[in-house]
Amino acid sequence: MSILNVIRSHHDVEPQNVEEEPPLTGQTIVTEDKLETSAKDKKHESPSMSEDEEGSVENVDAWDLTKALMSIDPNHPAHPHKWPLWKKLFVATVYTFLEVYVIWSSTACINFFDIYQTNWHCSIQVSYLVQSLFIVGNAFGPMLLGPMSDIFGRKWVYVGSLILYIIFQIPQALAYNLPMMAINSAIAGAFGSSALANVASSMCDIFTPETVGFGISLFVWGANAGASIGSPIGEALYDHWRWFYWMNMIVGGFFVILCVLCPETLPVINIMNYSSTTGEKTVQVSTLAKAKSAVVRTKFVLSTAFKLLCTEPIIMALGLYNGFAYGLIFLYLDGLFPVFVDNYKMGYMGANLTYLNFLVGVTIVVMLQPIQNWLYRWDKRRHGGVARPEARFLISLLTVWFFPAGLFWFAFTSDGRISWVSPLIAGGVLGVGDPQLWLAMINYITDSYPSVAGSAIAAFTLPSFAIAAVLVHLGIIMFDNMTTTWAMATLAFISLSLVATIYVIYFFGHLIRKHSRLAVTQQALQEAHDAKVLPEV
């Protein structure tokens, strides 16, 4: 039984002529005469896809596109999984450092807030809108860019959004009031968000399920590295702060060239190009070729991520969890200056350099990935060769405790009476716990929604960044009205409640996936494995 038939059979879709299905030969699995829409989907029924219907779009809608995307065979010779290692590493490296470049703006700007207050006569809360609206842009941008990359391809979404990101650096560099700065920061954040949703998707495109943990760890490393080095960069350019945005334009131009040089990673685009050369006919190629209508594609792009967020309990739960976790990190970062400048009498550059403990922490997370990958393969063997998405959390069952532990450690050793080294190391512990959780969640989502990963990650990102944007402003109130010790301790107590979520997903995630329309169920994975559709370890 093919993977499409397996998936469809668990979403009220009956396969046709299964007994007569030809053996796998390395080609795309599903042929046109094997697709029949169930009564549940009769409103857009298309039992056959003849060449006469090639130009028609009446029978193709956003759900048809989603099903076609989910039917891609990972063993197809044109699939990026078959690329040589050097090609995969080149693409992964370019996109990882693209993410570093975009994310550093989220923390670099905090050094300029007192300049905004002095020049534009605003309060500190208002000046923080530049940061929080950039994060809001990061939240909503993927809701459009993620689904666009799932249907039009990753490469040109990167290039187009990056060019627009560069353009909106100009009004920030020339800003003459705070509204101009904040609004353009939000727009730039939206276009730059392709480095969030789409980089993770690209890693899933090129790496197999057994090695994708490494690719996603690079994605997580890029996000945390960018946030870590952004603040020192901003401090270094403090006296010439407008040059930060001119520098962003120069560096961005370099990345545009690299993105143009990178090959397309979306499997369906590669397979369609292969099919146009060889004349191969498959269901997914026919469906996607028919979907030339701008209306159909626009419906897919605009509806898919929101549909996933509103109807998929996995994405909703993990998105809300990560929103609080990500927000707690911004609250923690709000506390670094009161701790290291006020309590330890460091200079501002010294305090900014303490952000680098997160860079050390996330580098340790990358180094832990061989252990997590071994545990993942061990769990797969233990379950008869069937991979469980929940196995992505195995190492996180331990490291999740680093989150509250790091916050408690920081809280009660940061009052200035104990060496500054202690809270610095505590921040490093937090820098291991938080990125490892994010890594596990991204892996889990991409395993559960493999061929609409861009849309799934976009849906996951929205609540994550929206909540974080609100908590940025809450941090100012907390540290103005509480001591640094009890402000940090409050964050630590809140983080304890988040630990349970990881255990719930690990032990009960397979039950949640059973009630999903798009997530791959464990039974579907088992049947696909039995049919030898999925690659062996």
UniProtKB/Swiss-Prot annotation:
**Per the record, which residues fall in region Disordered?**
10-56
Q: Basic and acidic residues bias located where?
A: 31-46
Q: What protein does this entry describe? A: Uncharacterized transporter C965.13
Keywords, alphabetical = Endoplasmic reticulum, Golgi apparatus, Membrane, Transmembrane, Transmembrane helix, Transport
The record's section on CDD domains has: MFS_Tpo1_MDR_like
Write out the GO biological process terms: export across plasma membrane; pyridoxal transmembrane transport; pyridoxamine transmembrane transport; pyridoxine transmembrane transport; transmembrane transport; xenobiotic transport
Query: Membrane-spanning residues where?
Result: 90-110, 133-153, 156-176, 180-200, 213-233, 243-263, 313-333, 348-368, 393-413, 422-442, 457-477, 492-512
The membrane-topology field of this record reads: Multi-pass membrane protein
Is this entry keyworded Heme? no
Checking InterPro entries in the record gives: MFS, MFS_dom, MFS_trans_sf, Sugar_transporter_CS
Please give the family membership noted in the entry.
Belongs to the major facilitator superfamily. CAR1 family.
Query: Where does the UniProt entry say this protein principally localizes?
Result: endoplasmic reticulum
Q: Which GO terms describe its molecular function?
A: pyridoxal transmembrane transporter activity; pyridoxamine transmembrane transporter activity; pyridoxine transmembrane transporter activity; transmembrane transporter activity
Query: Where does it reside?
Result: Endoplasmic reticulum; Golgi apparatus; Membrane
Q: What is the lineage of its organism?
A: Eukaryota, Fungi, Dikarya, Ascomycota, Taphrinomycotina
Give the GO cellular component terms, alphabetically.
cell division site; cell tip; endoplasmic reticulum; Golgi apparatus; plasma membrane
Q: Which Pfam families match?
A: MFS_1
